[in-house]
Amino acid sequence: MELIEKHASFGGWQNVYRHYSASLKCEMNVGVYLPPKAAGEKLPVLYWLSGLTCNEQNFITKSGVQRYAAEHNIIVVAPDTSPRGSHVADADRYDLGQGAGFYLNATQAPWNEHYKMYDYIRNELPDLVMNHFPATAKKSISGHSMGGLGALVLALRNPDEYVSVSAFSPIVSPSQVPWGQQAFAAYLGENKEAWLDYHPVSLISQGQRVAEIMVDQGLSDDFYAEQLRTQNLEKICQEMNIKTLIRYHEGYDHSYYFVSSFIGEHIAYHANKLNMR
């Protein structure tokens, strides 16, 4: 992994690395925050998945996560949201193609050549982190919007691999909303049964479980009713007896002003779970 940025932050280092991804067949950037204690011991890892139009920079420059990661001794890994490059398929829209990988494995041309974000996040990236950084095997996952969707899907499909999961403003019923329908049709084809592998509410209804789910949702979020539908997740978790910490916040929107307001509580939540295991 090639170090391309290094910034001192809260006694640790906010770095950005570039590496070639065998899963995605392109060069990828990834942000890694190493708290002060990483200089002398191995620490657990939180993977953060960003939302539509984002890259590895949005979370590390806007959320203020470094302060809390330093306090709780957690390495934070923030990858890009899709494969990148002039040779990678793209679309002339913000919600498909580069910047909109949806953390799935595409099966349809031209996307299936590079868009294997599920494999990248689940397998390739953790292997790189374990090999290059002072990381323990304990890991948790979180994300925002499209990234919240990805975090929920990865945790629900791999409950033994992630100690805990949380999300900000996640897309919980993607096959029922425009963002998900358009992306899934392109990446996965018209067989809607295949879509359910990346549909958190459906995964839970089929019996996939995690110990607990934490979600924060702003009630002034312009996408709440049409695209996110947090209440669907709350309802199915109640029906399936999955413990939740779902909080609705008056006045907060979909932006990083919202994420930065509550990221400290998410880091504390994950730190508590990681230290219990």
Curated annotation (Swiss-Prot):
Serine hydrolase involved in the detoxification of formaldehyde. Hydrolyzes S-formylglutathione to glutathione and formate. Transmembrane segments: none annotated. InterPro entries: AB_hydrolase_fold, Esterase-like, S-formylglutathione_hydrol. It holds the Pfam family Esterase. It catalyses: S-formylglutathione + H2O = formate + glutathione + H(+). Keywords: Hydrolase, Serine esterase. GO terms for cellular component: cytosol. GO terms for molecular function: carboxylic ester hydrolase activity; S-formylglutathione hydrolase activity. The active site is at S145 (charge relay system), D221 (charge relay system), H254 (charge relay system). It is an enzyme of class 3 (hydrolase). It comes from the Bacteria. This is S-formylglutathione hydrolase FrmB. Disulfide bonds: none annotated. GO terms for biological process: formaldehyde catabolic process. Belongs to the esterase D family. The gene is frmB. Its EC number is 3.1.2.12.
